[in-house]
Design a protein with these regions (language model features):
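Cytosolic regulatory regions of ion transport systems
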Residues: 3-4, 8-13, 17, 21-172
Length: 172
């Protein structure tokens, strides 16, 4: 082992060790706090994602979880990242599904989910028991198609009479 022999050397060593331990502890705490904040921002939907060739789930209701589960088990979508955009406080589903908090039709929410680079999207009705939800679904579809005209888009239809409107909005 190497250690200082003289009194002066020992004083310098102690004076160096104490701040060194403090700096190392501060560095570790800063890194840990940053990682925790990063994870919390993801759970609260406050992150911006840089994605390409991903699946967007716009809106959330009780059918959304089943649809995501189906996509997760379909070999065509197995490697494709999934990003949920919904006006909820926290993520409705665990990772590896990504979450963006906000109105599904807003430019900010679509931009933070890299909607312009999405390969496919599905829009869920805000209230599956209210036929008026089709109007909001059509607006979301229009907003997405404006950003990404090539996206393959499906939407939940409540009232069959509104089918033409959703097709006109770009739903496949």
């Amino acid at each position: 082992d190497l250690y200082p022999y003289t009194l002066g050397g020992r004083v310098v060593a102690v004076m160096t060790m104490i701040p060194g331990v403090g700096v190392l502890g501060t560095l570790a705490a800063t890194i840990a706090a940053g990682l925790i904040e990063y994870r919390e921002r993801g759970q609260k939907g406050l992150r911006t994602y840089m994605l390409k060739h991903h699946l967007l789930v716009l809106g959330w209701n009780e059918k959304s979880f089943g649809a995501i589960d189906d996509f997760r088990h379909d070999p065509r979508y197995l490697e494709m990242p999934i990003c949920v955009v919904a006006d909820l406080e926290t993520t409705p589903i665990a990772e590896p599904v990504l979450f963006v908090r906000g109105r599904p039709g807003s430019r900010d929410s679509l931009s933070r989910s890299s909607a312009e680079f999405a390969a496919a999207a599905i829009v869920f009705a805000n209230d599956p028991n209210n036929p008026q939800s089709d109007h909001e679904t059509a607006l979301i579809a229009l907003a997405l198609k404006k950003l990404n005209p090539k996206v393959r888009l499906s939407a939940e239809l409540i009232d069959p009479e509104n089918r033409e409107h959703l097709e006109a909005a770009g739903c496949d």
